[in-house]
A protein has these predicted regions:
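C-terminal functional module detector
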Residues: 491-493, 499, 513-526, 532-535, ...
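Bacterial Sec-dependent signal peptides at the C-terminal "C-region" and cleavage site
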Residues: 1-10
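Structural alpha-helical segments in enzyme catalytic/regulatory domains
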Residues: 291-293, 394-397
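His/Asp/Glu-enriched, well-ordered alpha-helical/loop segment
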Residues: 337-347, 351-377, 381-382, 387-391, ...
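Short helix-capping segments at alpha-helix termini
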Residues: 258-263, 292-293, 366-374
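Short, conserved secondary-structure segments in the cores of folded domains
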Residues: 11, 31, 499-502, 531
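Divalent metal-binding segments
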Residues: 9-16, 21, 25-286, 299-355, ...
Length: 635
């Protein structure tokens, strides 16, 4: 039993009769906790903690449910994601392509002209029973007149014929920088857009599509915060979304913070916006704000993840490793020197050990000139990080945030680099053993989903969402250790490890009551977990199941045709398994090209079952059909 002080009989909230994972030093479980003024004041058994209650105290019987500290997403494009959330149909966690296409069909019927239907990139073709993505023929049949954009992770996107017409794409349209428009034998764009290797080329294709109004962006941000609460996320570190202008594009989240209506705590980084003028960009941010500006719900934290355009170490494993330019060191040193001088924490996207070594050369040189002296900094991702560079990061006081990219791209990594290299990609256990701060984040929302239980599943099971084994037992984490990475571990990256990430007296009363017992259920069921009761700052922000009567009101979704207004349209495995399997069989059988006439695909073996593909390879010579679907012309 843990108890702070003798009770003052004045708790605002007491939850009891639960299985509460405190994440204290001993990893203790308790049955009850008490909250006062947004902070935990006591934890322990029911009898002792209920002594903190009086007639004014709200008491919630947990009925034996499991409680965890609110999850902290250490790498989320929360502010940018909030601005577009109401526009996006999500296929995250849907078990079959047939069901995904059913949702698409329903949304097409609901979407008025000239709006587009957009599927965000947080899904994998290999999560589907059919082991393939949609064909362009399927998209055109579903939406002959409505523009449809379907993004697959950060590697590719499908645009149906209506989208190509809306964009004015034809045989004279050049390939976008950093990408490729697949073409038919006559040079016409087929509708398949490939990131080669920059995923920004995918989202840029949507720039001409209608955007939300200011009022709808505000609503969209509210709905996204609630969606995060529904999966137990109570805090996020915003990694500095590309394309955002500070402070203009932060208006929605700042308005909600000013009104006291944010339900997810956000510490945000600011990134470079102009290639070749990054020092000027950061000098501007330094003049406008400073780390710590804001409050407990919204504040400036630091710089990144884009510190330098030429230092973007992309991780599309369908493409070769990015070769960074020789000018990188001098240019990056100028940026880091400015940040260290002004004591701005910073983060940098880094996939490959070769790049990480060069980045560390710069950091070590700057540190000799201007000591970091406790300044917090980190790398994001680090799939191929070596033991030698783990030691160098530790020596400079840095940390690493990992994202479940291997859960979605593990098969691609294995195809390019081999199963042996994949066994420690990223080397989470080695980083923890070296004493490195390690946090977990989603990388959402454009190229990844926001469900933290996918990351927990990946760290515990060592498997991809498609079921491919990636890691041996010695490289996997236990459930408590994985949870610690996604709570206390992540809190370190915003200097909040003494306020968040554990349920002990004095810390924020941020916690989630789970739909099932994370510590006991079959590991394969972890991605289906959600929160039935989420509390932030001692207040209920989400409630479901037996706690539904406690749910606070949420504004109606706007616009009314938003996918978010359609129950289930934001993803999740809420389909009946038998029906999903039946629809999957039918969908797999329909995988052959449906394009008629002389422009038909004519690819050998086209009618085969897509599920036979061991791994989808977009560039296989002489074979344009794979698990991502048919590459046939969209016209």
């Amino acid at each position: 039993m843990l108890r702070a002080t003798e009770p003052a009989h004045s708790a605002d909230l007491v939850v009891f009769n639960g299985k509460i994972a405190t994440q204290d030093e001993r990893g203790a479980f308790v049955s009850a906790l008490a909250v006062k003024d947004g902070r935990i004041v006591a934890t322990g058994d029911d009898r002792d903690v209920l002594r903190h209650a009086d007639v004014a105290t709200t008491r919630i019987d947990l009925h034996g449910r499991t409680v965890i500290p609110g999850l902290v997403d250490a790498h989320l494009q929360a502010i940018r994601g909030g601005q577009t959330f109401n526009l996006e149909l999500r296929w995250d966690g849907i078990p079959s392509l047939a069901d995904a296409l059913d949702r698409l069909r329903r949304q097409v019927r609901r979407t008025p002209a000239p709006q587009w239907v957009r599927v965000a990139g947080g899904w994998s073709a290999l999560q589907f029973a059919e082991k393939r993505g949609p064909t362009l023929a399927e998209l055109n049949a579903i939406a002959p007149d409505t523009p449809v954009f379907v993004q697959h992770l950060g590697d590719s996107a499908w645009l149906n014929a209506a989208a190509l017409r809306a964009l004015g794409y034809d045989r004279d349209t050049p390939d976008p920088g950093g990408g490729e428009l697949r073409r038919d034998r006559y040079g016409r764009p087929t509708g398949l857009l490939l990131a080669r290797p920059d995923p920004a080329v995918l989202s840029a294709a949507l720039d001409p599509a209608p955007a939300l109004s200011d009022g709808d962006r505000l609503n969209s941000t509210q709905q996204f915060m609630h969606a995060l609460n529904r999966v137990g996320v109570t805090s996020a570190i915003d990694a500095g979304g590309d394309g955002l202008v500070y402070p203009d594009d932060y208006a929605a989240v700042m308005t909600l913070a000013r009104r006291g209506e944010l339900t997810t705590r956000i510490a945000y980084a600011l990134g470079a916006r102009h290639a070749g003028r990054e020092v000027d960009d950061f000098a501007k941010w330094i003049a406008l704000t400073a780390p710590g500006d804001g409050d407990a719900f919204l504040r400036t934290h630091g710089a990144g993840e884009r510190l330098l355009f030429s230092a973007v170490d992309l991780g599309n494993f369908l493409e070769p490793r990015t070769e960074l330019p020789a000018s990188l060191e001098a240019d990056l040193a100028a940026v880091v020197r400015l940040l260290v001088r002004h004591r701005w924490p910073f983060r940098l996207h880094a996939t490959y050990d070769e790049s990480i070594g060069r980045f560390l050369d710069v950091f070590e040189a700057v540190n000799r000139e201007l000591p970091f002296d406790g300044l917090r900094w980190c790398f994001d991702r680090c799939e191929t990080l070596s033991d030698a560079n783990i030691a160098r990061i530790a020596a400079l006081g840095g940390g690493v945030t990992v994202q479940p990219r291997m859960a979605f791209q593990g098969e691609a990594f294995i195809a390019r680099y081999g199963a042996t290299a994949a066994r420690r990609a990223p080397p989470i256990r080695a980083m923890l053993a070296a004493g490195l701060p390690v946090g977990a984040g989603s990388g959402a929302t454009q190229t990844a989903g926001y469900n933290p239980f996918v990351a927990l599943y990946w760290m515990v099971s060592g498997r991809s969402v498609g079921g491919t084994p990636l890691y041996p037992a010695r490289a996997r984490l236990g459930r408590m250790d994985a949870l610690r990475v996604h709570t206390l571990g992540s809190a370190w990256f915003s200097a909040d490890e003494h306020r968040k990430g554990a349920l002990t007296p004095g810390r924020y009363a941020d916690f989630a009551v789970l739909s099932d017992d994370y510590f006991a259920i079959d590991v394969a069921r972890i991605p289906q977990l959600s929160s039935v009761l989420t509390v932030v700052d001692g207040k209920v922000v989400h409630a479901d199941a037996e706690f539904a009567s406690l749910a606070p009101p949420l504004p109606p979704v706007s616009p009314a045709w938003s996918p978010v207004a359609d129950r289930g349209a934001d993803g999740g495995a809420d389909d009946a398994a038998g029906g999903a399997r039946a629809r999957a069989r039918a969908s797999a059988a329909a995988g052959a090209c449906a394009e008629p006439g002389m422009d038909a695909c004519r690819t050998r073996g086209h009618g085969r079952r897509f599920a036979r593909s061991r791994f989808p390879t977009a560039s296989a010579a002489g074979d344009r059909c794979d698990a991502f679907g048919c590459r046939c012309v969209a016209f």
